[in-house]
Amino acid sequence: MSILNDFSHLSSEGPKLTARQQQILELIQSAITRTGAPPTRAEIANELGFKSANAAEEHLQALARKGVIELVSGTSRGIRLRSDTLRSIHESRVKQFSLPLQSLAQLALPLVGRVAAGSPILAQEHIEQTYYFESSLFQRQPDYLLKVRGMSMRDAGIIDGDLLAVKQAKEARNGQIVVARIGDEVTVKRFRRTKHLIELLPENPDFKTIVVEPGEPFELEGLAVGLIRNTMLI
């Protein structure tokens, strides 16, 4: 089993999970690492062979009661790993495996606020402050944090005020959550490329898909590789 997905002993003092709960927690972490967003109840049910999404919901509620995750109402992807869960996962890795020292080092991530038109996203004037995290918390090491503004990605569990961990990239696969620059605006959306167009899809029915026509100013700034609740940093 990969050390990045072993939750069998979250912490010597943490909640004891059933085998099924461990499996669901692993699935959640894997989905966030792979796509930048947690799975839906239906996706959990399909992956684990449940007859309905209700069965997945029951297990999620149990994990929430144990304080391992937080459920956000009103969104199909409203599942968040709590800060103490992330910390316990890290402690578990340190305790059970001999990790290289560099994987335990602190990672300095600049927080990008509002981005001025025409300026590089990591220009000094955009950086509000720097946060430090254990690098082993991220399977793909991010380059910076972006403060989320608005609710267009609500159903992916990404809401206003969250901090999105972003890996700089100029290419993306369909379905990945990306940070993109369209003209003077920087936005977080799900990426889809068709034969002639690029579509940036919201995860909220109240918002419209952004269609980028050939020749329009467009630049991919990075891929979402993690999500941090702003309240975790208070």
From Swiss-Prot:
The active site is at residues 152, 189. The keyword Ribosomal protein does not apply. Residues 41-61 bind DNA. One of its GO terms (biological process) is proteolysis. The record marks 117-118 as: Cleavage. Homodimer. Belongs to the peptidase S24 family. This is LexA repressor. It comes from Polaromonas sp. (strain JS666 / ATCC BAA-500). The lineage of its organism: Bacteria, Pseudomonadati, Pseudomonadota, Betaproteobacteria, Burkholderiales. The gene is lexA.
